[in-house]
UniProtKB/Swiss-Prot annotation:
Transmembrane region(s): 21-41, 51-71, 94-114, 117-137, 150-170, 192-212, 240-260, 261-281, 292-312, 335-355, 358-378, 420-440
GO biological process: amino acid transport
Cited function: Seems to be involved in glutamine transport. Complements an E.coli glnP deletion mutant.
Keywords on record: Amino-acid transport, Cell inner membrane, Cell membrane, Membrane, Transmembrane, Transmembrane helix, Transport
Subcellular location: Cell inner membrane
GO CC, any one term: plasma membrane
Membrane-related topology note: Multi-pass membrane protein
Name the UniProt record assigns to this protein: Glutamine transporter 1
InterPro entries: AA_Transporter-Related, Na/H_Antiport_NhaC-like_C, Na_H_antiport_N
Pfam families: Na_H_antiport_2, Na_H_antiporter
Chain segments annotated as coiled-coil in the UniProt record: none
Length: 442
C-alpha cells in the first residue's frame, strides 16, 4: 500500500479517536516510513532530520504570541469584548440578537482576514481575542463550530487570492517560484486570477456554514472563569497606549514586509510596545512567557508535522502515488484533474501546511499537467488548489489549531469533531469542486 495513503489514514483515525495530534503524527510517520521501505533507524533519522524544518515556524508563532499578548496589554481586546456585551445587554428580541450575532461574525471575519495582511500576527490573535468573547457567544447561543468555520475561512482564503502578507508568500514566493522552477512560463498577475474560482468555493462553503449548517442556536454551560470573561466594570483605556499599539502594528507589518520574516516583524512590534511604555521593562519576561505558553502546543504540532513531511519525502510516496494514478488515468483529462486534487488533499492533510505542500507536488504536477494539455492558468489552479486542500480540515494545520486554541478556553470545544470535521466538510469539498471547474474552464 502507498505509504502516503496509509500514514495519512492512520494519522486521521488516531486524531478522530482523540489521540494527541503530536503522538498521531509521530506514530503515523513511523508506520509510513516502514511501509515505504525505510528501516526503523532510517525512518527515525528522517523524522528527526525534518524536525528542524518546523523550528522557524515554531519560533515565529512564539514571537507572534508575545506580540499578541502585548497588543492585549493595551486594552484593545477588552474594549472590543465590552462593546459587544453592551450591545447585547437587553437584546431579548430575537431579531435584535440575530443582528448582533451576524455583526459579531462579520467583525471576527474582518479581524481574521486582517491578521493575514494588515496586522500580520496570523493565528496569534485568536487566543487573545476569542476567550473574552465566549461569554458573548454563550448568551447569543452561537454554535462554536460556526465560529471555527469563520476563523478558518479568514485564515485560508486571503492567502489564496490576495498577494499581500501571507498571500504574498504563498502566491509569489512559493507557488509562482515553484511553477517557474518547473519551467511553467506564467506571470505574477496571473496567479491570483487563476486562484479566484477556487477561492469562490471557500465563499460557498462559508455561506453554507453560516446560513444552513450551524444557524440553529446551541447551548453551552456557563463556566465560571474570571480569567476568560471580561469584568462587569467598564474598563478605562489609555489613549497613548492605543496610539502606541497602532505604531507597533505598523512597525511589525513594515519590518516583516522589508525583512521577509515574521520573527523579526513580531520582535519589532514587541520592542515598540516596550519602548513606548505599554509594557514595563520588568514585565517583558512575563509577557513573552505568556505568549510562548499560549502558542507552545501549536509549535510542537508544526515541528512534528515537519518531521512527518520529511519521512514522506524520504519514502518517495508522493511520486509513486502520482505515477500510479497517471498510468491508470490514460488520457482522461477530467479524471486527471480530480485525482491530482485528491492527492494534494492527502499530502496537505498529513503535512498540515499548504505552504510546505507546493514544493513537494509542483515538481510532479507541472509536467503532468502539461502532458495532459492543461493551460498555464489551469495548471496554476491545479497546483494552488491541491496545496490549499487539506489546510482547512487537517488536525495538524494551524488553520484549525488556531480556532481551537481560542474556542476551547473553557473546555467546551473539541478540536477534531468541532473544528477539523466541520471545516473539512465545508471547505475541502467545495474546493475540490471549484478547483476542478477551474482546471476545466481556464
Amino acid at each position: 500500500m502507498n505509504p502516503i495513503i496509509l500514514s495519512v489514514s492512520v494519522m486521521l483515525i488516531l486524531a478522530l479517536l482523540r489521540v494527541n495530534v503530536v503522538v498521531a503524527l509521530t506514530f503515523s510517520a513511523l508506520i509510513g516510513g516502514l511501509v515505504g521501505g525505510l528501516s526503523l533507524s532510517e525512518t527515525i533519522s528522517a523524522f528527526e532530520g525534518g524536525l528542524g524544518g518546523g523550528a522557524t515556524i515554531a519560533l515565529s508563532y512564539a514571537m507572534l504570541g508575545a506580540f499578541a499578548v502585548a497588543i492585549s496589554k493595551s486594552g484593545v481586546t477588552d474594549l472590543l469584548a465590552h462593546s459587544v456585551i453592551k450591545r447585547i445587554n437587553g437584546k431579548e428580541n430575537i431579531h435584535a440578537a440575530t443582528g448582533v450575532k451576524y455583526l459579531l461574525l462579520c467583525l471576527i471575519l474582518l479581524v481574521t482576514i486582517s491578521s493575514q495582511n494588515v496586522v500580520p500576527v496570523h493565528i496569534a490573535f485568536i487566543p487573545i481575542l476569542i476567550p473574552p468573547l465566549l461569554q458573548v457567544f454563550n448568551k447569543l447561543k452561537l454554535d462554536r463550530r460556526l465560529v471555527a468555520c469563520v476563523l478558518t475561512f479568514g485564515l485560508v482564503t486571503p492567502y489564496m487570492i490576495l498577494p499581500v502578507g501571507f498571500g504574498g508568500i504563498f502566491l509569489n514566493n512559493i507557488l509562482l517560484k515553484n511553477l517557474h522552477d518547473n519551467h511553467l512560463d506564467v506571470l505574477a498577475s496571473q496567479v491570483p486570477l487563476a486562484m479566484a474560482l477556487p477561492a469562490l468555493g471557500m465563499v460557498v462553503g462559508l455561506l453554507i456554514a453560516v446560513f444552513i449548517s450551524y444557524r440553529k442556536p446551541r447551548t453551552y454551560a456557563e463556566v465560571d472563569n474570571s480569567e476568560l470573561a471580561p469584568t462587569s466594570v467598564e474598563p478605562t483605556f489609555n489613549k497613548r497606549h492605543i496610539q502606541i499599539s497602532i505604531l507597533a502594528i505598523i512597525a511589525a507589518l513594515s519590518v516583516q514586509l522589508y525583512a521577509g520574516s515574521m520573527i523579526i516583524g513580531a520582535l519589532a512590534g514587541f520592542m515598540v510596545f516596550t519602548f513606548g511604555g505599554v509594557i514595563a521593562w520588568k514585565e517583558t519576561q512575563d509577557v513573552f512567557t505568556r505568549g510562548v505558553h499560549m502558542m507552545a502546543m501549536i509549535g510542537f504540532i508544526m515541528i512534528s508535522a515537519a518531521g512527518f513531511a520529511a519521512v514522506m519525502k524520504a519514502t518517495g510516496g508522493v511520486e509513486t502515488l502520482v505515477q500510479a494514478l497517471s498510468t491508470s488515468i490514460g488520457d482522461n483529462k477530467p479524471l486527471a484533474a480530480l485525482l491530482m486534487l485528491i492527492v494534494g488533499l492527502l499530502v496537505t492533510m498529513g503535512i498540515g501546511s499548504s505552504f510546505s505542500t507546493i514544493p513537494i507536488i509542483a515538481t510532479i504536477y507541472v509536467p503532468l499537467a502539461i502532458a495532459f494539455g492543461f493551460s498555464p492558468m489551469a495548471t496554476i489552479a491545479l497546483v494552488g488548489t491541491a496545496a490549499a486542500l487539506g489546510d482547512a480540515g487537517s488536525p495538524a494545520s494551524d488553520s484549525t489549531l488556531g480556532p481551537t486554541s481560542g474556542l476551547n478556553s473553557d473546555g467546551q470545544h473539541e478540536h477534531v469533531w468541532e473544528t477539523v470535521v466541520p471545516t473539512f466538510l465545508h471547505y475541502n469539498l467545495p474546493l475540490i469542486i471549484f478547483g476542478w471547474i477551474a482546471a476545466m474552464v481556464l
